[in-house]
Amino acid sequence: MKRIIEPLTQMGAHISSLHGNGCAPLVIEPGKLHGIHYTSPVASAQVKSCILLAGLYAEGETSVTEPILSRNHTELMLKEFGADIRTVHQLAGSEATSVIQPCQELHGQKITVPGDISSAAYFIAAGLLVPDSEILVKNVG
């Protein structure tokens, strides 16, 4: 959680770890967000997604620079929903910057989420924990 607490705090969010160790549980209080230009020490789709989603509601432009481009599923989804977002690559295999503008009016779309065993595992585990339950997971490889 520490990896997302830091940039969100830089944006003006009020987030603290209940036990002071940077781990959940967290205390999150409302705050006015402002855009930042964040350079991530590692390529992480999770950290990048968190910052870009917060950037939708921030005042001013928000960008995330990674040493190499991580998975871009959030950027593709936000662009499809109408967000003003772009990714700039320097060279193949080198740093990439994703930039989003605030105050977007997003438009819902019909989407299909690809099968992913790591996501399905939670539902499978839940089905195993509940006696006499049934679960059907399709198209997961």
What are these regions (language model features)?
Residues 1-141:
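Structural preference for solvent-exposed beta-strand-turn elements
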